[in-house]
């Protein structure tokens, strides 16, 4: 990661602290992975507090593939099997079958409908029958032990939520440029500065968790 591009957001640890502070308030955090991996930035919100306005931001400025990052425990509770039997994706992204709230939504596509689906999935009393398949929200199963086990945005979302005292679930979407191409670090920094988002890298989160044994 080109650290010079992130200098305005502070040191590695300062970036994590700022990200945790803003996430605790229910605000979004922009998480960047390694330039040799996906080289993308995901805007992430806590699943249990996400608003329709925040979801609309993800849809407006993201790829449109809004994902709900959750633990294996919740996947099992909701009986969400893997999307495919043999995962051949480069980064082994653990998609499950897609979901839609069984009640309270229309077509499931709008920002409000997707928020409803997310809230239903992470509710304390959630059960398999609360969800229909397929749907317009894409659950992702996080690796146990988070970014220390897999340096992905899925794990970063769950780690951020857990570290902030939320249920271990986050809503993410990759940020894109206006022309539809993927936003890279320079564009992501400009995006964060324009909208006032905290920026943190997965490398930052790994270092923080390792240092403080969290």
Swiss-Prot record:
Mg(2+) 2 binds at residues 38, 153. Pathway: Cofactor biosynthesis; riboflavin biosynthesis; 2-hydroxy-3-oxobutyl phosphate from D-ribulose 5-phosphate: step 1/1. Its EC number is 4.1.99.12. Gene3D superfamilies: DHBP synthase (3.90.870.10). D-ribulose 5-phosphate binds at residues 37-38, 42, 150-154, 174. Mg(2+) 1 binds at residue 38. Keywords: Lyase, Magnesium, Manganese, Metal-binding, Riboflavin biosynthesis. Its cofactor is Mg(2+); Mn(2+). One of its GO terms (molecular function) is magnesium ion binding. GO terms for cellular component: cytosol. The keyword Thylakoid does not apply. PANTHER family: 3,4-DIHYDROXY-2-BUTANONE 4-PHOSPHATE SYNTHASE, GTP CYCLOHYDROLASE II-RELATED. Belongs to the DHBP synthase family. Catalyzes the conversion of D-ribulose 5-phosphate to formate and 3,4-dihydroxy-2-butanone 4-phosphate. Homodimer. This is 3,4-dihydroxy-2-butanone 4-phosphate synthase. It comes from Mannheimia succiniciproducens (strain KCTC 0769BP / MBEL55E).
